[in-house]
Amino acid sequence: PRLRERVWRQVGEGQVRVVAGARSALFLPFNELGLIVVDEEHDPAFKQEDRVFYNARDMAVVRGHIGNFPVILSSATPSVETRVNAQTGRYARVALPSRYAEAALPELAAIDLRRHPPARGGFLSPPLIEAIRKTLEKEEQSLLFLNRRGYAPLTLCRVCGHRFQCPDCSSWLVEHRFRGQLVCHQCGHTEKKPEACPECGTLDHLVACGPGVERIAEEVVAHFPDARTIVLSSDLVGGVRRLRLELEAVAKGEADIVIGTQLVAKGHNFPNMTLVGVVDADLGLALADPRAAERTFQLLSQVTGRAGRTGKKSRGLLQTYQPDHPVMRAIVSGDAESFYEREIAERERAGLPPFGRLAGIIVSAASRAEAESHARSLRRASADAAAIHVLGPAEAPLSLVGGRHRFRLLVQGERKSHLQGFVRKMLADGPKVRGSVRVAVDIDPQSFL
């Protein structure tokens, strides 16, 4: 708090002329702001989704418009919205045709897991294991990427089938073996992993299902016991300080094999890294999200870009059950243009952003019946307009978070429709918010959970 107070004062007094910050930096009291650079503008983390909903990237553009100064949106994998704005002339486009220092792009290939399955109980295919071995022989570094924290996303009993679920959320508890805990990644609930099943009482029959980065690290050590292995994940003991030290160690070449989540995809420079293996390239494609293909393309492009940044010959290998998926084909061929053309055409056909407008309405309450009743009453109070219609209500994919039951409505409108006015009238004509009911409105939602 003291540091924030000092920065606030120094910016307001003009003592600080350049600020590098997160979303909240937009609200500092600049007197002579003349430029905003939004780095990695495609990153969904720019959208705040609790309490006050806003997209910092869009707020930066608005602030630049109000102050009549330039705003730079930079990304190697721009969002579809930004891409369309550049194509239509709303934004100027400056293309960077090559990597820094003219470094060659990595050679990319898909490993078809139907033809090259991992060994029983493992998650690394024979071609990927062989590629790691050859990289070690050359005394170069490998990165194994899996966007899943912890050891395993699900723990169950082999005897009765009991699954460990958060008592306050509709999500499975994730085993974190390094910490000996089961953790909810939605609300933060933690509990010690028991030795016996709480349902049937059977000892030593709890099994981990699926991999997280900790489990991949265990498999790597089994294959390469002499290699220096490091796990990079945001929730490891030691916090930000430990993470910074470990990133520095990787950059200095003090690790042979790195296993990491999406934080390793964010602009880090590892000079001796020449192999990137994506353990599960299909992970994001199954999400019920209109941006699922775009997000997967961006994430995989960014993480494979960690290889060969200093000019060394490098490779990126994507383990997938869908090698013919348009996202996989675009990444392997290096043809980003075809991906964007296809994605933009599909969005336009479906009337999805940026060719249409969306608003999410999330109704939550202490009881399921209360949340559902309010959501249905809200829907009955709204009549579809000519260019706007309402979908739902339906139970949210994450139907219980922090002890609150959740239902969602989705308002979809044409690009020039007055969506905010429609939602405002819908809330005014609907039932009054009483008891434990809470209603949140998310214009242009980035998450549909």
Q: Where in the sequence are the language-model features?
A:
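Structured alpha/beta or helical-core interaction and ligand-binding surfaces enriched in interleaved
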Residues: 390, 424-426, 434-441
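Juxtacatalytic substrate-recognition/specificity segment
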Residues: 404
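Short, charged, intrinsically disordered terminal tails
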Residues: 443-449
